[in-house]
């Protein structure tokens, strides 16, 4: 697994934990709950993702709500919210990864943590956000 993939996986887990139990962000970002060996750069990238999502969460959630047609935001699973938030942050606020790669990675993470059906749901929302809210860069 690539370092970036590991970082995204850690970030999804951290965002999940924040949503589920609401511990202080500082505590979550210590990653004491993550039991796999990671490199400092993997943790640093995960921290930057989580901090970016938390900083921009209101705008991110507004877009997720806008494009999750026929789904009340409260019905979206916590895991799917975490993946969507991470991915919308990457699409709108990060230029490190091509946008199509961001969506592909989100779909794979969703398949890993949730299901094929959830992956289609996440893909649909992210694709709509990509088409309507971002400048295209592939």
Swiss-Prot record:
Belongs to the NusB family. GO terms for molecular function: RNA binding. CDD domains: Terminator_NusB. One of its GO terms (cellular component) is cytosol. Keywords: RNA-binding, Transcription, Transcription antitermination, Transcription regulation. One of its GO terms (biological process) is transcription antitermination. This is Transcription antitermination protein NusB. Involved in transcription antitermination. Required for transcription of ribosomal RNA (rRNA) genes. Binds specifically to the boxA antiterminator sequence of the ribosomal RNA (rrn) operons. HAMAP family: NusB (MF_00073).
